Structures are given as C-alpha cells and as structure tokens.
Amino acid sequence: MASVNIKPLEDKILVQANEAETTTASGLVIPDTAKEKPQEGTVVAVGPGRWDEDGEKRIPLDVSEGDVVIYSKYGGTEIKYNGEEYLILSARDVLAVVSK
C-alpha cells in the first residue's frame, strides 16, 4: 500500500477496496460483469475527527491507517487518484474492523 497525498477532512476515511473474489468455492471463474462490489477495504488515510458540540475538542475515529474494514455497500464516494481507485467514506459508513 503506497502513501497517498490525500488527507480526509473531519470524520472521513480514505479506503482502498480489496479485490473481489474471482472464483467461487467450487472453482468457477466469476466474470467481471457478475462480480459484486467489494465491501471490504484497507484504510489508507484517516481524517482528524469531528469537533464536539462545544467546538473545543476533536472526537477521534475508531479506525486507523492499515486497518481492514467492512463498509456499507452504497456508502462513500469513489475517486481515482494517480491511476488507483479509492473510496472516501464517512466514519458512520464503516460497519466493522476486521481483526488481524
């Protein structure tokens, strides 16, 4: 995972989607047109967090760079940067962190 010059704002998270499965458990090859959009990815960058209600302290996020996360199927904004595809998600679109 290369370093990226994109710094998310507030509670936003930059994720690079993990590759979708290319074969089934029985060995059948899945064509690109039939693959489901992946819902798992690696966190590349994390914003500093939202401000609290008083505007005095930032509320830190529950994820950090390098975490593998599962995110909402339709959440986030897809972007392309330096030939790579990324997803910018709000912290609320992250459903779980996968344990290593």
From Swiss-Prot:
Keywords: Chaperone, Cytoplasm. One of its GO terms (cellular component) is cytoplasm. SMART domains: Cpn10 (SM00883). InterPro entries: Chaperonin_GroES, Chaperonin_GroES_sf, Chaprnonin_Cpn10_CS, GroES-like_sf. GO terms for molecular function: ATP binding; metal ion binding; protein folding chaperone; protein-folding chaperone binding; unfolded protein binding. The keyword Signal does not apply. PROSITE patterns: CHAPERONINS_CPN10 (PS00681). Disulfide bonds: none annotated. The keyword Chaperone applies. SUPFAM superfamilies: GroES-like. GO terms for biological process: chaperone cofactor-dependent protein refolding. It holds the Pfam family Cpn10. Together with the chaperonin GroEL, plays an essential role in assisting protein folding. The GroEL-GroES system forms a nano-cage that allows encapsulation of the non-native substrate proteins and provides a physical environment optimized to promote and accelerate protein folding. GroES binds to the apical surface of the GroEL ring, thereby capping the opening of the GroEL channel. PANTHER family: 10 KDA HEAT SHOCK PROTEIN, CO-CHAPERONIN GROES. This is Co-chaperonin GroES. The lineage of its organism: Bacteria, Bacillati, Actinomycetota, Actinomycetes, Mycobacteriales.
